[in-house]
A protein has these predicted regions:
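Short Fe-S-cluster ligation motifs
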Residues: 97-114, 147-157, 175-191, 196-199, ...
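Iron-sulfur cluster-binding cysteine motifs and their immediate structural context
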Residues: 42, 70-92, 114-142, 148-167, ...
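Short Cys/His-rich Zn2+-coordinating modules
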Residues: 46-57, 100-104, 131-134, 153-156
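N-terminal secretory signal peptides
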Residues: 1-18
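Solvent-exposed, charged amphipathic helical/linker segments at domain boundaries
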Residues: 167-176
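N-terminal twin-arginine translocation
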Residues: 15-22, 33-51
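Sec-dependent signal peptide hydrophobic core
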Residues: 27-32
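Mature N-terminal segment immediately following signal peptide/propeptide cleavage
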Residues: 57-76
């Protein structure tokens, strides 16, 4: 009996109208061509955008956060030189009508694998920065304030913020462009929110969280001190 008789031959999947072999050749060639400029790029002859994964991510423990807003103040300080909640790129929301562990929501940029905000930007201000570990960031000199990137963000609250002072959009860059941070930021460097959190409710990781799990960025960072309170093993599965 022939192999073909045992295993039915399936139609080869198509990628933007190309067969698999052509797709792989095209993406390889396009990757080489784009490696010099380091931006997300469109596959020739398709409407598919390809971008390298970020080399760093922030994860949080909403059950550990105490809502002090230190991370928000520090974020605005290292980016803008002033402590302002409205200029922070990380957002902490508190609900007085809820009790622990549902009283605080921490919202951080996911540095999405297939970033909708990057795709939506009409002027390439929102881009993949290979100089700083492929972090998804916004070039304020290119941003025209159209807010299409904010609209494209699939998360609530939106992980991109409108800057009321510059009339442009900003987002977390893992502290890659922080003129007021003494340390080197960006993937592999210092993230100010992680460094200053008094309870360790924010962590930096280099492995991409599961992009199909909306709760993957909300992890358990509680330690032995929490065990005595009986709170160590309580997983808080909410969208991070």
């Amino acid at each position: 009996m022939q192999f073909e008789e045992i295993v039915p031959q399936c139609e080869e999947p198509k990628f933007g109208g190309m067969d698999r072999r052509t797709f792989l050749k095209t993406i390889a060639a396009a990757g080489i061509a784009a490696s010099g400029i380091g931006a997300a790029f469109m596959l020739p002859g398709t409407n598919l955008m390809v971008m390298p994964n970020s080399k760093g991510y922030l994860v949080v423990d909403m059950g550990k956060c105490m809502g002090c807003d230190t991370c928000m103040m520090t974020c605005s300080l290292v980016h803008h030189g002033e402590a302002s909640l409205s200029l922070s790129r990380i957002q902490i929301q508190q609900d007085a009508f809820q009790s622990w562990p549902n009283d605080i929501h921490m919202a951080v940029c996911h540095q999405c694998e297939d970033a909708p905000c990057v795709k939506a930007c009409p002027v390439e201000a929102d881009h993949v920065d290979i100089v700083h570990g492929n972090v998804r960031t916004i070039d304020p000199d290119k941003c025209i304030g159209c807010t299409q990137c904010i609209d494209a963000c699939p998360w609530l609250p939106k992980r991109l913020q409108w800057n009321p002072e510059t009339k442009k959009v900003q987002k977390c860059d893992l502290c890659a462009n922080t003129p007021y941070l003494r340390d080197k930021g960006g993937p592999g460097g210092t993230q100010s929110c992680v460094k200053v959190c008094p309870v360790g409710a924010i962590a930096y990781i280099d492995k991409i969280p599961d992009q199909n799990d909306p709760t993957a960025y909300n992890v358990n960072l509680r330690d032995k001190a929490w065990k005595s309170l009986g709170m160590t093993d309580i997983d808080i599965k909410r969208e991070g």
